[in-house]
């Protein structure tokens, strides 16, 4: 069991239930899934770059990524429909909690010139999205074996009904929001 999952059940649920006046514990917002996405536009010219991105994402998440393909052709970007242009992973359950714990405690503090994450990155329905400029902030990535520094998108999907509830949920886990 991940420590944050136990912490959520033991303390965060009762804290949020009192704060927002929920009648049932099932109304309390929870983290549903965490999606990691890595776009590799350069994969059009060099297929090896996509393989390296897949390997990096697999190391970070502990799960085999799905290779994403272009939905439609765009002449300006020189891509055709069906070309592999990135990879993504959806984490749920135990792996999600373990990743979330590593993200907060290990990875985010290793970001260069870190001053906190923006609280404006909520989508209006309590889901939070953030971008990471370099994958080397994760301890699973061996710095010497990295061929190219890549960024990735991290989306935390919650059952919160609005941004206020979503922010309260993440703040209860000591999520490092900018003051």
From Swiss-Prot:
Name of the protein this chain belongs to: Large ribosomal subunit protein uL5
Function: This is one of the proteins that bind and probably mediate the attachment of the 5S RNA into the large ribosomal subunit, where it forms part of the central protuberance. In the 70S ribosome it contacts protein S13 of the 30S subunit (bridge B1b), connecting the 2 subunits; this bridge is implicated in subunit movement. Contacts the P site tRNA; the 5S rRNA and some of its associated proteins might help stabilize positioning of ribosome-bound tRNAs.
NCBIfam families: PRK00010.1
GO biological process: translation
Quaternary structure annotation from Swiss-Prot or TrEMBL: Part of the 50S ribosomal subunit; part of the 5S rRNA/L5/L18/L25 subcomplex. Contacts the 5S rRNA and the P site tRNA. Forms a bridge to the 30S subunit in the 70S ribosome.
Gene3D superfamilies: 3.30.1440.10
A single GO cellular-component term on record: cytosolic large ribosomal subunit
Top-level taxon of origin: Bacteria
Pfam families, per the entry: Ribosomal_L5, Ribosomal_L5_C
Keywords linked to the UniProt accession: Ribonucleoprotein, Ribosomal protein, RNA-binding, rRNA-binding, tRNA-binding
The keyword Chloroplast appears for this protein: no
Organism: Haemophilus influenzae (strain ATCC 51907 / DSM 11121 / KW20 / Rd)
Entry similarity comment: Belongs to the universal ribosomal protein uL5 family.
Any GO molecular function: RNA binding
């Amino acid at each position: 069991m991940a420590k944050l999952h136990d912490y959520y059940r033991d303390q965060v649920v009762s804290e949020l239930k009192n704060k927002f006046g929920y009648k049932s514990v099932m109304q309390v917002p929870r983290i549903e899934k965490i999606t990691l996405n890595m776009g590799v536009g350069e994969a059009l010219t060099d297929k090896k770059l996509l393989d390296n991105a897949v390997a990096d994402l697999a190391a970070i998440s502990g799960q085999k990524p799905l290779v994403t393909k272009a939905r439609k052709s765009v002449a300006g970007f020189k891509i055709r429909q069906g070309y592999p242009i990135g990879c993504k992973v959806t984490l749920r359950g135990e792996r999600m909690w373990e990743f979330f714990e590593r993200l907060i405690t290990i990875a985010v503090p290793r970001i260069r010139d870190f001053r906190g994450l923006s609280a404006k990155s909520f989508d209006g329905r309590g889901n939070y999205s953030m971008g990471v400029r370099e994958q080397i902030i994760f301890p699973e990535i061996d710095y010497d074996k990295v061929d190219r520094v890549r960024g990735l998108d991290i989306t935390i999907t919650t059952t919160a009904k609005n941004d206020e509830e979503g922010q309260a949920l993440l703040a209860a886990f000591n999520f490092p929001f900018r003051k």
